[in-house]
Regions:
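N-terminal small-domain helix-loop-helix segment of the aminotransferase-like
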Residues: 2-89, 96, 344
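Short acidic capping loops at alpha-helix termini that bridge into adjacent secondary structure
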Residues: 79-84, 183, 201-202
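Short Gly/Ser/Thr- and Asp/Glu-enriched loop/turn motifs at secondary-structure junctions
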Residues: 81, 286-292, 318-322
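Conserved PLP-anchoring active-site segment centered on the Schiff-base-forming lysine
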Residues: 100-119, 126
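Active-site phosphate-binding strand-loop segment of PLP-dependent enzymes
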Residues: 128, 133-187
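Conserved PLP-binding catalytic core of the aspartate aminotransferase-like
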Residues: 268, 280-312, 327
Length: 344
């Protein structure tokens, strides 16, 4: 085996990540449609300490970790610092977890987050794919799940946006398999299973600052799990993996989260309006609880509508099951509705 043969093997077998082309109305990556608040940008820049820029900064910093503990704690449950760690975006966390558990049987339930497939091929993992039965997990096909298995599950699901039921989540947890619950869109659904880490040592919850907090460019993710899992993850992940400025922006966002909660409310209102409008047009729309809507379409119809939207300067995400449309600002959503009305 030579290095050149390794290079060619990767080029042949590892799928490259590709995003949709940028257009004026870009609704393909579930980005927050509102700019990061200017007053908070100013606060972040005022807080930058030039003496810290040449140094390696702990990730997470003590201040950021304290804010995360406060934010993650919910109801009567109080998280501990040792139950949280961070990543350069949730994607890095997923990549590291796939690397950690690559020798186990790893399961995904298509349609699901496309990067599971991409990252798995990159680290040499063969995924076990058990397609959803409609929008439900086919539990009858998972009777052999045990502690030799790892399940990656977005909740709300991506690309469909629907929530899985308590029964499905608990069946997976009670199987003994490690459940990596990807809560990237948690803030738009209001449902989390994070407190269950106290009862289930086989649960990891992964989240991001990219969606609800509008910090996709800063690459900030975090995970919540029992202390043993977090300790193992910290030994595998890269040191200093989250930048000083990224942590600063995330810390300021958490300290001012009421601003973002108001924006989330607006996005949820627009999501429901968009879902209703598309259903009135006759589309089969999932009951999304994320910051996007999903329209079930066959390949031919999805291609036709995708192309027509592009001609109007609107980019959405085309998948093998239909179109995923990120919720934009009101005028962007109006443009989508108007364009689709013209196609029907």
């Amino acid at each position: 085996v030579s290095f050149s043969s390794v290079v060619e093997e990767i080029r042949k077998n590892v799928e490259a990540y590709r995003s949709e082309p940028r257009t004026l109305t870009y609704l393909a990556l579930n980005e927050n449609p509102y700019p990061f608040p200017e007053e908070l940008v100013r606060e972040c820049f005022e807080r930058i300490d030039a003496s810290r820029l040449p140094t390696y900064v702990d990730s997470p910093s003590e201040e950021f970790l304290n804010e995360l503990v406060d934010y993650v704690s919910i109801g009567g449950w109080k998280a501990q610092k040792e139950q949280i760690s961070v990543g350069n975006g949730a994607d890095e966390i997923i990549y590291v977890l796939l690397s950690m558990f690559k020798d186990l049987s790893i399961y995904v339930f298509p349609p699901t987050y496309s990067c599971y497939e991409i990252f798995a091929s990159a680290v040499g993992v063969k995924l076990n794919r058990v397609p959803l039965a409609g929008e439900r997990i086919d539990l009858e096909r998972l009777k052999d799940l045990n502690e030799d298995c790892v399940v990656f599950l977005p909740n709300p699901n991506n690309p469909t946006g629907h929530l899985f039921t308590d029964e499905e989540i608990f069946r997976l947890l009670n199987s003994g398999a490690l459940l990596v619950l990807d809560e990237a869109y948690y803030e738009f659904s209001g449902r989390t299973y994070a407190p269950l880490i106290e009862d289930y040592s086989n649960l990891i919850v992964v989240r991001t600052f990219s969606k609800a907090f509008g910090l996709a460019s800063q690459r900030i993710g975090y995970l919540i799990a029992n202390t043993a899992l977090i300790d193992a993850y910290n030994r595998i992940r890269l040191p200093y993996n989250v930048s000083y400025t990224g942590q600063l922006f995330a810390t300021v966002a958490l300290k001012n989260r009421r601003i973002f909660e108001e924006r989330i409310e607006r996005i949820v209102e627009e999501r429901e309006r968009l879902k209703s409008a598309l259903r009135r047009l006759g589309f089969n729309v999932s009951d999304s609880k994320a910051n996007f809507v999903f329209v079930y379409l066959d390949q031919k119809e999805a291609e036709r509508i995708h192309r027509a939207l592009l001609e109007r300067g609107i980019t959405v995400r085309k998948t093998g099951w239909g179109l995923r449309i990120s919720v934009g600002q009101t005028q962007q959503n109006d443009l989508v509705i108007e364009t689709l009305e013209g196609l029907m």
